[in-house]
Design a protein with these regions (language model features):
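Post-transcriptional modification and biogenesis factors for structured RNAs
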Residues: 1-279
């Protein structure tokens, strides 16, 4: 039995969505829904599932029919996370470029801390046989891993979702317990930082990166024929920072000014005055 109001816990967890990419087995979808319902999560997004709908989904989602009715189906991962501010991509393997990597427990704490600040969060799970592609993982701010037995580190997707959902719930309960204790202290601890601008969404960042790469190409810093790992490293950099709206528009304004200067479409005011005096 929970010591806290389940309605309040579920309200915070409602800002966290579970995303399953190209899931093959309908049973995994049904089991994932039941795992989510047990821990108080409610939003599941399926990216191009191989088989949907299917009787096995209903059978395995026993008791979670309300969640099943709310499942969202989309064609791409970009669409699934477009309004999210913070994205975690699950990964069991090291990649070409090291990415900010968190075990499930600290990752859950970060997710719940962000949710408490009004952010939308996505936890993305890949295919049963090969997980997420490098391109899909590059859309995440952080990679998330579950520290399993190195001799037999095998979890199916539904089991992994159960572990993650449990850790998310425990993070909410722990946060509420800390807040309750802090209220009795002279100086409350663990308070969230109040920011003056909202963070940008993943959809906005997907407009940001092409602009950045176009500007870098125009100043001949990026070779589009041989970009090497530069675009990926830039994604890692800005994904780690999490831009707010003001920073986003500031940087895009700088990119546009650099492009204008490079193309000769913009001149400094002093140059304009000098031209006028010589006329």
């Amino acid at each position: 039995m929970s010591l806290f109001d389940d309605t309040a816990v579920s309200k915070q967890l409602a800002q966290v969505r579970i995303v399953m990419v190209n899931t093959t087995l309908p049973a995994n979808i049904g089991s994932a829904l039941r795992a989510m319902k047990t821990m108080g999560l409610s939003k599941l997004v399926l990216v191009s599932p191989k088989t949907y709908p299917h009787p096995d989904i209903q059978a395995l989602a026993a008791g979670a029919q309300d969640l099943l009715e709310q499942v969202e189906i989309v064609e791409t991962l970009e669409e699934a996370i477009k309004d999210c501010h913070l994205v975690f991509g699950t990964s069991a393997r090291s990649r070409t470029i090291p990415w900010p990597l968190l075990d499930v427990r600290p990752a859950s704490k970060e997710a719940i801390k962000a949710a408490a600040q009004g952010q939308q969060i996505a936890i993305v799970f890949g295919r049963e046989d090969r997980g997420l592609t490098n391109e899909e993982l590059a859309l995440a701010n952080y990679h998330l891993t579950i520290p399993v037995n190195s001799d037999y580190g095998v979890l199916n997707i539904a089991q992994a979702i159960q572990v993650v959902c449990y850790e998310l719930r425990m993070s909410v309960l722990e946060q509420k317990e800390v807040a309750s204790d802090a209220g009795q202290m002279p100086l409350a601890q663990g308070q969230s930082m109040q920011w003056d601008e909202p963070l940008v969404t993943q959809q906005q960042m997907e407009e940001f990166y092409p602009h950045l790469e176009k500007m870098l190409t125009e100043i001949e810093f990026l070779d589009p024929e041989n970009p090497r790992l530069l675009p990926l490293r830039l994604r890692r950099l800005f994904g780690r920072i999490q831009l707010d709206r003001m920073e986003y528009h500031l940087l895009r304004g700088i990119f546009s000014r650099v492009q204008a200067l490079t193309s000769g479409k913009w001149k400094k005011a002093s140059s304009d005055k000098e031209d006028q005096s010589n006329a």
